Every structure is written in C-alpha cells, then in structure tokens.
C-alpha cells in the first residue's frame, strides 16, 4: 500500500441503514429508484442497489444496527470503505488509534471493522471480504438504473462543538484524509463551520459540520438525532434534471429555493449555459467559479427524509467543490424551514 494511502482506500462500498420501522426505509429507497436485489437468508437484512450505490437496510435484532436505531432513530449506522486488502487496512487502523468492532455472531457482516462516529461502524471491504457475502439470497443481478443515481459523492458528519478536531484527527491519523475545503457560514440568525475532508484516493469526501450557536440546524440535528452522526448523503447523477423530475414524480420532496436566487444566476455565472427555466422549475442550485475552466456543479437537497437525515442530488460538470456559492442561499432556506416548523424564531 502507498504511504499516502495507508489503508488502500478506493471509495465507498456501501452504506448501511437501520431504524425503528424498516418498512419506511424500504419504501423511501424504493421511491428514490433503488431496487431490493438480495435478502439475507436468516436475518431481516435487505440489499438495495442503484447504479454503483449499495444501501443495506439492517433490521436484525440484538445487534449494532438495532442499538444504533434505538439511540438515534432512523439513519446510517455503518459505512463500508473499499480497500485493496481488508485485513491489512484493519491492522493499520488499529495500530493508528482505531478501536476494533465485532457485531453479534448472528448479525456478523464477515468484515473487519472499527468503531466510528456516534456509535456507527466503518467496515473494510475488498474482493475477498464482502458484506454477508455467503448469506444473500440474490433476487436480481441486473443493473439497476432507477432514477439515474450512480454513486455516493460525499456524506457529512454533524459533530458537537469542540469535536471537529477530534474527528478530523480520526480520519487523518487512520486513513490520511486531508482538509480540502473550509467554510464559515453565517445565516441571518445562526451559523456553522464546515471542514471538508478528502481521502487519498479522492473518492471519499466527508465534510464535518459544527454549530456556532445553540439554534442552528446542526444543533437541531444533534438534539433530534440524540448525538453525532451522518446528516446528509450526496448521490451523483449524470442528468440532474431527469433524476430530480423522476424523484418528484415518486413523491420525494425537495427544499424550496427563493425565486430571487434564479434572478441572480446570470450575474454570478454569466458563462453557465444551463437552461435557466428548467433550473428554476426544478429548484436546482448551480455553482461554479469565475473561470469556466473550473467547471460547474448542479445540486439539490431533499427535505428531511427520515428523522433529521436528508439527501443531496449532485451533478458535477468539472467542478470539485461542494456548492460553496450556494451555501448562503441554502442555509437561509433551511432557516426559513426551521421558522415554519417552529424550531427557530424569526428576528423582527
């Protein structure tokens, strides 16, 4: 393994979800275009696929997934990282501060693993070590196009104030993640700091979010989720207009964006060449730099899908940012949603 990539990382292998009501998770993923392609032979565990994305819904009892759901409600209870050699990656992780994790025997994934944020787990996945590899009844081996979602782009961690350095150090010391972006976002009433980390392979990106006050959406998440964890998951598409239109038809709800946002796009990005009417109709956000060579990014955020967890749909047209130019507009949109829901009082 290369020194700069000590665990031999090569992207996300899967995300695992659990919750008090697994039917809601099944329904939500089906609405998003995922297809159940395998079921565990002995446990209530289902594998959903779309494009290269693998979501496992784990409703087994007396195991880590159930414990995570009892603490946090519905959410992502584990991540699988693709590596060249799962055993070697695990040994490196333990030697650099990782704490080994072992699930109950009946729910064992058959993968080396370490403890991660908020009682979640990171599993190491290679060609020989696949989750529940001999335990699946496979119902479909056909590729799943669904709504055109192709891969996991990034996911965020919401952390307690003062814990950002702790989790940045966790990912740096074990996996050699580096800071690739830093944001200081101020809404009208609340604010947050975000530090985006990137893996040596360039395929795993994890922004860490920390609140600057008691009322922000980060604090609301930590309160409702009963702790730190994965706040949102960004999924790639090659045609965001088609994907979003399809998701809306399936009943997926997205955050509203003020009309004034679209009036400013041509001034912000005069070179963009995107269909403005279509952007506006689907409420898709656009971002880029002054120089067209840095490319464009198109993105949209769902409302909270289960608990305080939501999804982002993202299409990268050469831009590797996170939509920094949209953060302000989005942050204020979420503040308006908080005011509507009564969790934030509007300043008068």
Curated annotation (Swiss-Prot):
Domain VOC, first and last residues per copy: 11-141, 151-303
InterPro entries found in the cross-reference section: 4OHPhenylPyrv_dOase, 4OHPhenylPyrv_dOase_C, 4OHPhenylPyrv_dOase_N, Glyas_Bleomycin-R_OHBP_Dase, Glyas_Fos-R_dOase_dom, VOC
Cofactor details (free text): Binds 1 Fe cation per subunit.
UniProt-listed Enzyme Commission number(s): 1.13.11.27
Top-level taxon: Bacteria
GO biological process: killing of cells of another organism; tyrosine catabolic process
Top EC class for this record: oxidoreductase
Residues noted as binding Fe cation in the record, renumbered to the chain: 154, 232, 312
GO terms, molecular function: 4-hydroxyphenylpyruvate dioxygenase activity; metal ion binding; toxin activity
Keywords assigned by UniProt, alphabetized: Cytolysis, Dioxygenase, Hemolysis, Iron, Metal-binding, Oxidoreductase, Repeat, Toxin, Virulence
The keyword rRNA processing is assigned to this record: no
Catalytic activity: 3-(4-hydroxyphenyl)pyruvate + O2 = homogentisate + CO2
Needed cofactors: Fe cation
UniProt cross-references to SUPFAM superfamilies, sorted A to Z: Glyoxalase/Bleomycin resistance protein/Dihydroxybiphenyl dioxygenase
Function: Catalyzes the transformation of p-hydroxyphenylpyruvate into HGA. Has hemolytic and brown pigment production activity.
Family: Belongs to the 4HPPD family.
PANTHER family listed in its UniProt record: 4-HYDROXYPHENYLPYRUVATE DIOXYGENASE
Protein name, UniProt field: 4-hydroxyphenylpyruvate dioxygenase
Organism expressing this protein natively: Legionella pneumophila (strain Corby)
Gene name of the record: lly
């Amino acid at each position: 393994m290369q020194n700069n990539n000590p665990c031999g990382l090569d992207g996300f292998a899967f995300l695992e979800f659990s919750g008090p009501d697994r039917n809601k998770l099944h329904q939500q993923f089906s609405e998003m275009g995922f297809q159940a392609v395998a079921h565990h032979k002995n446990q209530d565990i289902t594998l959903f696929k779309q494009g290269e994305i693998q979501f496992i819904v784990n409703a087994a009892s007396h195991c880590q997934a159930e414990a995570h759901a009892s603490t946090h409600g519905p959410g992502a209870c584990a991540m699988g990282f693709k590596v060249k050699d799962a055993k070697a990656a695990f040994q490196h992780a333990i030697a650099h501060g990782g704490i080994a994790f072992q699930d109950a025997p009946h729910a064992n994934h058959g993968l080396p693993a370490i403890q991660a944020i908020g009682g979640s787990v990171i599993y190491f996945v290679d060609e020989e070590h696949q989750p529940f590899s001999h335990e699946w009844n496979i119902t479909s081996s056909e590729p799943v196009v669904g709504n055109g979602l192709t891969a996991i782009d990034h996911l965020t961690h919401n952390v307690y104030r003062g814990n950002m350095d702790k989790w940045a150090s966790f990912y740096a010391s074990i996996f050699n993640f580096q800071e690739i972006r830093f944001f200081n976002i101020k809404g009208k009433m609340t604010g947050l700091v975000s530090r985006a980390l990137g893996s040596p392979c360039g395929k795993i990106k994890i922004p860490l979010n920390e609140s600057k006050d008691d009322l922000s959406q980060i604090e609301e998440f930590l309160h409702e989720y009963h702790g730190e964890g994965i706040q949102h998951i960004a999924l790639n598409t090659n045609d965001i207009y088609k994907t979003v239109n399809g998701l809306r038809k399936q009943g997926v709800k997205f955050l509203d964006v003020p009309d004034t946002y679209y009036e400013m796009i041509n001034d912000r990005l005069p070179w963009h060449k995107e269909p403005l009417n279509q952007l506006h109709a689907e409420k898709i956000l656009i971002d880029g730099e002054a120089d067209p060579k840095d490319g464009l990014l198109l993105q949209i955020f769902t409302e909270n899908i289960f608990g305080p967890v939501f999804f982002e749909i993202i299409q990268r047209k050469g831009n590797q940012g996170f939509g920094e130019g949209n953060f302000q507009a989005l942050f204020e949109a979420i503040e308006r949603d908080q005011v509507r829901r009564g969790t934030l009082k509007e300043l008068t």
